[in-house]
Structures are given as C-alpha cells and as structure tokens.
C-alpha cells in the first residue's frame, strides 16, 4: 500500500511526514483493516505514546475495519481503558465484529459514526479440530468469550443481556442512526457548515 506523504513548512524549513505520522501529531489514530496482533501492537503503541505526551487531551480513533482476532481487539480495548486520556471513537465505513466492540468502548459521550457508516455485531466465530476433548475445550472457550462480548455490549449500549444475546445470535447490521438508537454510539458526525 502506498502511504501518502505530506509536506509542512516550519521555521526551520520543510518537513515531510507520512500521513499517519502527521495525523498522530493531532492525536488521531487510524484503525483500518483486519484486527490482528500486528495492528493491535501498533494501535497500542500509539495510544501509550499519546497518553504519555499529554493524558488530559482526547485521542481520536477513526475505525474502518471488518473486525478480526478477539484477543488482539481486547488488547486494544484494555489499553483504551487503562490510559488516562479519553479515547473518542469514530466509525467510518464499517465497524464490524471486534471493531464494533472497540467503537462501543470509546469514552461515553464521545463515540461517533459518520452518516453512512455501518456497524455489525454478532457472536464470536471460531472452529475446532482434533480429539473430542480438544473440541470440547475450544467450545467452552468460545462460549466464555461470547459471554464476555455480550456483557461488554450490554454495558456499553444500555441494552439488557437478553436483547444482546438475541441480536448477536446472527449478523446484526446497523446504520449509524440504528447504532445510535441501540446505544453503541452517542452521536452521528455531520459537517455543520454544509
């Protein structure tokens, strides 16, 4: 992937940044693509860096992701909750599966979606093979994970656990307005000048 470069004029001359580094200067983190260990490590490092710089200012996390590995996503969520800086989450395009959990775990009152963003919640996906005992262990683990995810969604949305269980039984797609009504986000971002 080609990463754009931006040129800034400073008192000392010109300085070139890749676009993500320039956005980071403004406390903006881009979470895009599949959630995996490599991406999570990058997001966590950025969160820790910005929090160490100034833990009184908001961090803005723009999310456009189909989701991914639950443990990687939960590492991001745990870091968001660990640092002192408030983390504002903004869905752009798609916040699906694990990415919808990250979106909902943003600072209350600071969880947003752009008007045409889509949010998807569902139960964890997994598979198992091997001996019967190994399959049973994997099944028990995914049920524990499902319970944890449902509890997080209930806490973040204000929906009761039975509603969450029902709605995550299958893919549950939501528009930005539906995600707001459901309680996963607090507002829809629109340009007030247009």
From Swiss-Prot:
Catalytic activity: Hydrolysis of proteins to small peptides in the presence of ATP and magnesium. alpha-casein is the usual test substrate. In the absence of ATP, only oligopeptides shorter than five residues are hydrolyzed (such as succinyl-Leu-Tyr-|-NHMec, and Leu-Tyr-Leu-|-Tyr-Trp, in which cleavage of the -Tyr-|-Leu- and -Tyr-|-Trp bonds also occurs)
InterPro entries per the UniProt record, alphabetical: ClpP, ClpP/crotonase-like_dom_sf, ClpP/TepA, ClpP_His_AS
Enzyme class: hydrolase
The keyword Hydrolase belongs to this UniProt entry's keyword annotation: yes
GO CC terms in record: cytoplasm; endopeptidase Clp complex
EC number: 3.4.21.92
Pfam families xrefs: CLP_protease
Active site positions, chain numbering: 97 (nucleophile), 122
Gene Ontology BP terms: protein quality control for misfolded or incompletely synthesized proteins
Subunit structure: Fourteen ClpP subunits assemble into 2 heptameric rings which stack back to back to give a disk-like structure with a central cavity, resembling the structure of eukaryotic proteasomes.
HAMAP family, per database record: ClpP
Protein name: ATP-dependent Clp protease proteolytic subunit
Name of the gene this protein is made from: clpP
